[in-house]
Amino acid sequence: MTEVRLRFAPSPTGYLHVGGARTALFNWLLARKQKGTFILRIEDTDVARSTQESVDAILQGMEWLGLDWDEGPYYQSDRFPVYKEFVQKLLDSGKAYKCYCTPEELEAKREQALMDGRKPKYDGTCRELAGDVPGKPHVVRFRAPHEGVTAFDDLIKGRIAFNNDELDDLIIQRSDGTPTYNFVVVIDDATMGITTVIRGDDHVNNTPRQILLYEALGYPVPHFAHVPMILGADKARLSKRHGATGVMAYRDMGYLPEALVNYLVRLGWSFGDEEIFSKEDLIEKFSIEQVGRSAGVFNPDKLLWLNAHYIKTGDPSRLAGLLVPFLRERGVDPTGGPDLVAVVKTLQERSRTLLEMADGALFYFRRDFSYDEKAVEKFLTPEVSPLYELLIAKFASSADFTHQSIEQIFKEICEEKGLKLGQVAQPARIALCGGTVAPSIFEVMEVLGKEETNLRLEKALAFVRRG
């Protein structure tokens, strides 16, 4: 049985965007499902645009998403001698030829074709030259067949066929000696034994040229699966104007990697009506044949909903660790306050991102917050002073300070004073948190502890007395 080998081959000319991440994810899932090998290859033949910073960003994005690779990263820039060797093989076998046409001549041919109403393509001027022209600059072209059909069965799109007379004699080596993309990708996939190529559907038109190269070199043609692109809400191709498109930007906005993975895989693939998938679920259930043929529309609200789910159901200890940098960005030392895991537990239910959780946690670590003006007008009236005094006295005399015992004290005060719970809880919440929107007041008090709770109640009492 042939070993299953898949690859993700990004160009390091920018960050890892969500479209590339989804392609990587589909390749990774199929490799893991079929117990195959997942290879990372960096396509950096465009030396002018490729940067180490982009390579680092791609690797960081892959690692954050948990898409581990079995081989690589391989760099095309390290393989130029290999490509030259294969160019020479094609020249020696007559399957490639040197083209001496100048850029000006080619442009004139193109303009003439357009004037004649023909599709611009190389006219084969140098295809049958008898010999070399020493010292004259040249490119190397692949001698494509002019008759017949090149077809393949795309795992997503089905049967796709191209008439060979529509295909150009592809340039495989530029005049400066560097190889072209369509050539090197075939050499890499062939020599690395890639069995399935999953990539964006903007590569469909490259596929017949690449298949002809495989056949000319005597290598087996891999299976192809062309994934539809991702669109914004306006049905235009997803870009920066639609919001964040970089994977690490979502990390910095407080998203969890499992939420983005879950969202991206569902953007084009489905398994019944299920919405929530762990990585283990995905490996078991994923099928490239179940990826839809139409473009997926990126829905930030759906991603936010998924992220909220993963925060709500996440391990508080892990979330606490992830929350630390967000707190530090806000000038908070998480070691200088209540237990962070306990803090997280009170915020999981209502936080949609780690950024929201960090903002919601600030009151735990700061006493110098100001009170919400509307809340002050409504709740911090002179009549609330005896209530604060009673809470302080009851907490001081209570040996136990759990959320259950705190709740019992609130109930006692309500019964004694003939008040509703909100009439006691809201002034207390303002004293402890600065406003009326906060987690359960009983849990907040337990996390802050008796001493800090009473300090904040006394501060609020002094505020009310000052009027």
UniProtKB/Swiss-Prot annotation:
Compartments (UniProt record): Cytoplasm
Highest taxon above the source species: Bacteria
MF-aspect GO terms: ATP binding; glutamate-tRNA ligase activity; tRNA binding; zinc ion binding
Residues the record lists as binding ATP: 240
A GO CC term assigned to this protein in UniProt: cytosol
Pfam families given in the database record: Anticodon_2, tRNA-synt_1c
Enzyme class: ligase
Cofactor note: Binds 1 zinc ion per subunit.
Cofactor: Zn(2+)
EC number: 6.1.1.17
GO aspect biological process, one term: glutamyl-tRNA aminoacylation
Motif extent ('HIGH' region): 10-20
Binding site for Zn(2+): 99, 101, 126, 128
Keywords: Aminoacyl-tRNA synthetase, ATP-binding, Cytoplasm, Ligase, Metal-binding, Nucleotide-binding, Protein biosynthesis, Zinc
CDD domains the UniProt entry points to: GluRS_core (cd00808)
Location of the motif 'KMSKS' region: 237-241
PANTHER family given in the database record: GLUTAMATE--TRNA LIGASE, GLUTAMATE--TRNA LIGASE, MITOCHONDRIAL-RELATED
Function: Catalyzes the attachment of glutamate to tRNA(Glu) in a two-step reaction: glutamate is first activated by ATP to form Glu-AMP and then transferred to the acceptor end of tRNA(Glu).
Quaternary structure and interacting proteins, as annotated: Monomer.
Protein family (similarity comment): Belongs to the class-I aminoacyl-tRNA synthetase family. Glutamate--tRNA ligase type 1 subfamily.
UniProt-recorded name of the protein: Glutamate--tRNA ligase
Native species: Geotalea uraniireducens (strain Rf4)
